[in-house]
Structures are given as C-alpha cells and as structure tokens.
C-alpha cells in the first residue's frame, strides 16, 4: 500500500516544478543561487548582463581576483542556469578575459575608455593590464602638450593643404626681405626682427590652440595673416613705402598691440560651429571696426577680411630736415 501511495507522488511533484531553467533568462531572480560545480572545466559568467563562456584555466592562470574566486578559496554562487553573477559593468570584461588568455590586448584609443578599463583591471587585480593602461594614459597626457612645430610654407598649394587639413585657427607670418626694391629706413631691420620674435613667442604660448605657419616665399616683406575655419579673417601688413629723401625707402613697422588683438580675435574660431555673432560684433570681428550697419548681409560680413596697413607718424628725430614725408601702400 505504501508503494502504491508513493507511486503518484513523483508525477505530482513534477507538475509543481518550475519551468526548465533553459527557458529562463540567465540571472533570473526566480531561482535561488547555488554553489558552482567543483568539477566543471568551463564557467558561464554573467557580468552586468554581458554573458561570457570561458575555462577555469583562463580564469586561474594569473594571480587575480578571478583566480581567488574560481580556485576554491572563495565560494562562488550560480543561478539556476549555471551562470556566475558578477555585479560589475560587462563593457570591458571581454578585454579582461582576452588579457588573461593571451597576456596582452590592444588598448582603446580613447582616454576615457582607457580610464574605464583601468578601473576594471584594478577591480579584478590584473596587475599587468593595470600597468599597460597606466602607461598608455601617461603617453596620452604627454601628447596633450604637443611639440611646438611650425611648418614653413613652400608653395601656395602647400599652404592650402595645411589650411584644409587643420581644424585649428591659423596664424601665418610672411617675411621675405628679398622682395624689397628700395633701401630700408633706419628702424626697419629692428622692427622686422621684432615681428619674427613676437611670432615665435606667440607660437610657444598658443601652439596647442593655434596652428602657426611661416612663409618666406610670398610677395610681401612682412605681413601677418589670420585664418579661421579655412578662410582668411584678418591681415596686418607691416610695410609701407616712404618718400623721405630723393629715393624711396621701405619702412617696416611693429604693430605689437594690433597683432596681439588679432591673435586673440582668431581664438574665437576654435569652436567648430563658428564664432558667436554677438561676440564677433563686440570684438569688432568681421565688421572691421563696427562701421557697417546692422542691415548688411550677414554672409558678406562673414567673408570680409580685415586688412590693416600700419601707418605710424614719423617722429621728429626720424624726419630728415626740410623733407616732407609721404606714405604709399
């Protein structure tokens, strides 16, 4: 009788059983956790919803937190589907596993992703990967302070290629003494040198934000050009012809304040979306001094170039006695 009574019990128990674990998503909370099967050579990992299937040999090959988990030193619990649950982001766990298999992995290019991977490597105590990530981040930080390289323009075509290949605003200094047909005034050589020295100082100060070009083949003697988003925004010409004696002379000026002003103005074009029109107006931007009315066409205004030809009054000491000074651009 006891045998008959016990007969239908398994069937009844079977009817009360939950659905097969294979039909439920890994990590479902409807199942209680249980210890990992000790004799298994393979491990199913659920890391923050990212599923991975690997071997115990991979997980225990290096002295990491994963080795401590799967070498028997720490009890590891699985869900009903046999998945080991790890409460971490699974975004970089595949990279962690590849490093444990091969001893090296290609690292992300992004500094942000490198930092994320470094955080995961520290959590899992993967010392070799920690060192690789730290070295890569250090190299990226060093690249953030780039070398101060100043290309020298050798042709108009090369200049256009340089302008098209950079997203930075551009400052170009053209200086070419061989263009002079006349003698220089007494201060011209000194002023030409001052322009070159200022260009070098600006390049050292702003080379991370601006591209500096040097042109020694152009048609001017000394001229600054400022470019934003591939087009010329302003130009400061530092030379003029002086009729001070019986012969013409070339005068080179050093408009330091104007050069500083235009350099700061061109920084507005660092933003890839272009300068703010209100800021452009406030700084005298493309309007070239604010003389134009608000009714001017905005597109024409954007494409104007501020051309400043320096004209400084000659002091009494520089003016030859009895001679009238005439400037001609």
UniProtKB/Swiss-Prot annotation:
For whether the record's keyword set contains Nucleotidyltransferase, the answer is: no
Which pathway does it take part in?
A: Protein modification; protein ubiquitination
- Cytoplasm is among the record's keywords: no
* Domain BTB per the UniProt entry, residue ranges: 41-109
Q: Which GO terms describe its biological process?
A: cell migration; negative regulation of Rho protein signal transduction; positive regulation of DNA replication; positive regulation of synaptic transmission; proteasome-mediated ubiquitin-dependent protein catabolic process; protein homooligomerization; protein ubiquitination; stress fiber assembly
What is seen without this gene?
Reduced synaptic transmission in area CA1 of the hippocampus caused by increased levels of RHOA. Brain size or neural progenitor cell proliferation are not affected.
Region called Disordered, residue ranges: 1-31
Keyword list (alphabetical) reads: Nucleus, Ubl conjugation pathway
Q: Name one GO molecular function term.
A: protein domain specific binding
Q: What do the Gene Ontology cellular component annotations say?
A: Cul3-RING ubiquitin ligase complex; nuclear body
Which coarse location class applies to the principal site listed for this UniProt protein?
A: nucleus
Task: Fetch the SUPFAM superfamilies from UniProt.
Answer: POZ domain
- Tell me what induces its expression: By TNF-alpha.
**InterPro entries given in the database record:** BACURD1-3 (IPR045068), BTB/POZ_dom (IPR000210), SKP1/BTB/POZ_sf (IPR011333), T1-type_BTB (IPR003131)
Q: Which subcellular locations apply to this protein?
A: Nucleus
- Describe its partners and assembly state: Homotetramer; forms a two-fold symmetric tetramer in solution. Interacts with CUL3; interaction is direct and forms a 5:5 heterodecamer. Component of the BCR(KCTD13) E3 ubiquitin ligase complex, at least composed of CUL3, KCTD13/BACURD1 and RBX1. Interacts with RHOA; with a preference for RhoA-GDP. Interacts with POLD2 and PCNA. Interacts with SPRTN.
Could you say which protein family the record assigns here?
A: Belongs to the BACURD family.
The entry's function note states: Substrate-specific adapter of a BCR (BTB-CUL3-RBX1) E3 ubiquitin-protein ligase complex required for synaptic transmission. The BCR(KCTD13) E3 ubiquitin ligase complex mediates the ubiquitination of RHOA, leading to its degradation by the proteasome, thereby regulating the actin cytoskeleton and promoting synaptic transmission.
Name of the protein described by the UniProt record = BTB/POZ domain-containing adapter for CUL3-mediated RhoA degradation protein 1
Protein's organism:
Mus musculus
Query: Which gene is the coding source of this polypeptide chain?
Result: Kctd13
């Amino acid at each position: 009788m006891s045998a008959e009574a016990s007969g239908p019990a398994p069937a009844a128990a079977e009817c009360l059983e939950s659905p097969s674990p294979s039909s439920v998503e890994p990590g479902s909370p409807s199942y209680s956790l249980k210890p990992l099967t000790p004799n298994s050579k393979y491990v199913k990992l659920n890391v923050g919803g990212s599923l991975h299937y690997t071997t115990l040999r991979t997980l225990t090959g290096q002295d990491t937190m994963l080795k401590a988990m799967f070498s028997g030193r720490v009890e590891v619990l699985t869900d009903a589907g046999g998945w080991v649950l790890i409460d971490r982001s699974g975004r970089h766990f595949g990279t962690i596993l590849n490093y444990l298999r091969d001893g090296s992995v290609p690292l992300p290019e992004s500094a942000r992703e490198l930092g994320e991977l470094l955080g995961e490597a520290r959590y899992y105590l993967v010392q070799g990967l920690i060192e690789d990530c730290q070295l890569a981040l250090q190299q990226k930080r060093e690249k953030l302070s780039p070398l101060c390289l100043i290309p020298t323009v050798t042709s108009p075509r090369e200049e256009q290629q340089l302008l098209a290949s950079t997203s930075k605003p551009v400052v170009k200094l053209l200086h070419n003494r061989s263009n002079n047909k006349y003698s220089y005034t007494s201060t011209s050589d000194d002023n030409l040198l001052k322009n070159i020295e200022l260009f070098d100082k600006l390049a050292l100060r702003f080379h991370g934000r601006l591209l500096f070009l040097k042109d020694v083949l152009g048609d001017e003697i000394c001229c600054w050009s400022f470019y934003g988003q591939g087009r010329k925004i302003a130009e400061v010409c530092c030379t003029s012809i002086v009729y001070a004696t019986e012969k013409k002379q070339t005068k080179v000026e050093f408009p330091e304040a104007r050069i500083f002003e235009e350099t700061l103005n061109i920084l507005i074009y660092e933003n890839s979306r272009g300068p703010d029109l209100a800021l452009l107006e406030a700084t005298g931007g493309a309007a070239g001094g604010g003389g134009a009315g608000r009714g001017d066409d905005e597109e024409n205004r954007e494409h104007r170039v501020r051309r400043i030809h320096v004209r400084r009054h000659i002091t009494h000491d520089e003016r030859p006695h009895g001679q009238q000074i005439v400037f001609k651009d």
